């Protein structure tokens, strides 16, 4: 499950969210597990809390959708950017730029199903089978074959989540 900051209309106050986020940061630090961050239009609050808290082993910015300056700051802090279908949307050139500049070890791809359906299926319910379209877009941005990106993000996921792939 994710935790984080959401400045949407029907969300708890940022103070309540911050308290929950700090609890989850402590839990991630104590357990050695990755911290999966949800962020919607709350970049400044989120970055402030993360800068002011203990650093978990891995911080993943799930369904990354923030501006390029936030991507750069997040990457500088060692956070992982997880790209969803929104990276394929025509208007999201900054997300594609973030995919280009991210160090290889700081990239993941995801579906965020049932939301953020990638092109060419935008508007339909997102399905796990569509993650290949997101991966293909990120691969193209990085000048990689989709298979190479698949190997890269599989290795990253195994490292971040402590999964032994038996290879």
Feature names for model-found ranges:
Residues 1-77, 97, 120-129, 144-146, ...:
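Divalent metal-binding pocket/active-site signature
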Residues 29, 100-101, 140, 159:
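Solvent-exposed polar/charged
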Residues 39, 63, 79, 86-87, ...:
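Active-site metal-binding loops of divalent metal-dependent hydrolases
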Residues 77, 102-103:
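Short, structured coil segments at secondary-structure junctions
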Residues 82-97:
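Active-site glycine- and acidic-residue-rich loops that bind
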Residues 105-127:
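Short acidic/histidine-rich active-site segments
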Residues 130-167:
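Mid-to-C-terminal alpha-helical segments outside catalytic/metal-binding sites
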């Amino acid at each position: 499950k994710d935790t984080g900051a959401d400045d949407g209309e029907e969300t708890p106050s940022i103070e309540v969210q911050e308290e929950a986020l700090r609890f989850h940061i402590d839990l991630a630090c104590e357990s050695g597990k990755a911290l999966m961050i949800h962020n919607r239009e709350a970049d400044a609050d989120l970055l402030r809390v993360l800068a002011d808290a203990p650093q978990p082993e891995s911080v993943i910015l799930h369904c990354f959708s923030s501006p390029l300056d936030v991507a750069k700051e997040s990457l500088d802090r060692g956070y992982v950017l997880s790209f969803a279908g929104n990276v394929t949307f025509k208007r999201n050139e900054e997300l594609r730029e973030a995919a280009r500049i991210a160090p290889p070890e700081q990239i993941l791809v995801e579906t965020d199903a049932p939301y953020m359906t990638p092109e060419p299926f935008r508007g339909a319910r997102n399905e796990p089978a569509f993650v290949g379209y997101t991966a293909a877009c990120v691969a193209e941005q990085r000048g990689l074959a989709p298979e190479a990106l698949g190997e890269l993000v599989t290795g990253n996921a195994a490292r971040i989540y402590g999964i032994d792939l038996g290879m």
